[in-house]
Amino acid sequence: MSMTFAINTIKHPSIWEGLVRLPLLLLLLSFSVTLSAQNADKLYKEAKALYDAKDYTLAFPKLKTAAEKGHKKAQYRLGRCYEKGRGVTKDEIAAFQWYGKSAAQDYAKAQYAVGNCYKEGIGTAKDHKKAVEYFTKAAQNDNADAQYQLGKCYLKGKGITADAKKAASWFKKAVNNEKDGKDIIAKIRKKVAEGDEDAKTIMKLAGVKP
């Protein structure tokens, strides 16, 4: 502590008081942030239970409050509400915006959803390059749907240079995904049964038995 600073603190005690109060203010701020996060998580869990029970009207306001507090899962599910018109008037632009907020927090489901919005033109203009960008992020975060879609992008050369080897690699990751691989396999087999020629190619590249 310099002599000048020491003299100033004697002449102006408010300086010293400020220094003493600063750690307390930081502690209170930290506590407030933690409490807000806990409240958001509690709201999300309540909302998810209602959402899963298809009580969208009651789920929506809780999801919105949690989403506004920055809860990434709530932001994603709020996007679903807006996209599908669940508990609120359908609004694809709002859906895209909320998916984007969640995706920015590295939430794989939201990253996939943003990619799908760019692929299908949901709430934004179609942009296959952007779709690939977000599918890649979600695929690298082990999202099976994104791995499957990324494989299709490489297979068809949509938004990226066609590459059969990379397509096969992503299809294999999708069908071997620990969480959702079985669902992807079921999807491929269903499409093959319906006579989808692309699905037959995907089945072969993924190494899935008929």
Identify the function of each model-found stretch:
Residues 1-20:
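N-terminal secretory signal peptides that target proteins for export/translocation
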Residues 40, 176-210:
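Terminal, low-structured helical/coil segments at or just beyond the last alpha-helical repeat
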Residues 40, 72-74, 108-110, 144-146, ...:
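Helix-start (N-cap) detector for alpha-helical repeat units in TPR-like alpha-solenoids
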Residues 50, 68-71, 84-86, 91, ...:
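Short helix-capping/linker turns of helical repeat alpha-solenoids
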Residues 42-50, 62, 77-84, 113-120, ...:
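Hydrophobic face of amphipathic alpha-helices that form TPR/SEL1-like repeat modules
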